From Swiss-Prot:
Protein's organism: Bacillus licheniformis (strain ATCC 14580 / DSM 13 / JCM 2505 / CCUG 7422 / NBRC 12200 / NCIMB 9375 / NCTC 10341 / NRRL NRS-1264 / Gibson 46)
Protein known as: Transcription elongation factor GreA
GO molecular function annotation: DNA binding; RNA polymerase binding
InterPro entries given in the database record: GreA/GreB_C_sf, TF_GreA/GreB_CS, Tscrpt_elong_fac_GreA, Tscrpt_elong_fac_GreA/B, Tscrpt_elong_fac_GreA/B_C, Tscrpt_elong_fac_GreA/B_fam, Tscrpt_elong_fac_GreA/B_N, Tscrpt_elong_fac_GreA/B_N_sf
Protein function: Necessary for efficient RNA polymerase transcription elongation past template-encoded arresting sites. The arresting sites in DNA have the property of trapping a certain fraction of elongating RNA polymerases that pass through, resulting in locked ternary complexes. Cleavage of the nascent transcript by cleavage factors such as GreA or GreB allows the resumption of elongation from the new 3'terminus. GreA releases sequences of 2 to 3 nucleotides.
UniProtKB keywords: DNA-binding, Transcription, Transcription regulation
UniProt cross-references to PANTHER family, sorted A to Z: TRANSCRIPTION ELONGATION FACTOR GREA (PTHR30437:SF4)
Family the UniProt entry places it in: Belongs to the GreA/GreB family.
GO biological process: DNA-templated transcription elongation; regulation of DNA-templated transcription elongation
Length: 158
């Protein structure tokens, strides 16, 4: 039997996924079933766009429930025990400057399940995180990005 994928995440990230799962199971699922019921009442299902739309949404919701359930079941909680606080690792926030112009950026490195670049949380599978993991303050690192290579210097890890 194949081993299931492990999803590294913070305790906060796991709680957010659990909340989303609960919402989908208790609220959204019922809303979609009601939409299907209403659409069925319109008659002929062969040309019923409301019915098709509701069925598509139901498939999406059920798929998301399955995905979230799997992620939560296979979550590996990242604990910040304070050890190696000078090394970039999962759960750490790393601040670096882009060389040579010195533009500063900060990201928290998290598991893919809770990545949200708009909130400054990047996946440990991202090119930037892969380049930074295991490095220390003062290290200069070449990062591969979709836009090409960039050289950065790590200035802070917290």
């Amino acid at each position: 039997m194949a081993q299931e994928k492990v999803f590294p995440m913070t305790e906060t990230g796991k709680k957010k996924l659990e909340e989303e799962l609960e919402y989908l199971k208790t609220v959204k699922r019922k809303e979609v079933v009601e939409r299907i019921k209403v659409a069925r009442s319109f008659g002929d299902l062969s040309e019923n766009s409301e019915y098709d739309s509701a069925k598509e949404e139901q498939a999406f919701v059920e798929g998301r429930i399955t995905t979230l359930d799997n992620m939560i079941r296979n979550a590996k909680i990242i604990e910040d025990d304070g050890a190696n606080s000078d090394i970039v690792s999962l759960g750490k926030t790393v601040t670096f400057t882009e060389l040579p112009d010195g533009e500063e950026e900060s990201y928290t490195i998290v598991g893919s399940a809770e990545a949200d670049p708009f909130e400054g949380k990047i996946s440990n599978d991202s090119p930037i995180a892969k380049s930074l993991l295991g490095k220390q303050v003062g290290d200069e690192v070449t990062v591969q990005t979709p836009g090409g290579e960039m050289l950065v210097k790590i200035v802070k890890i917290s």
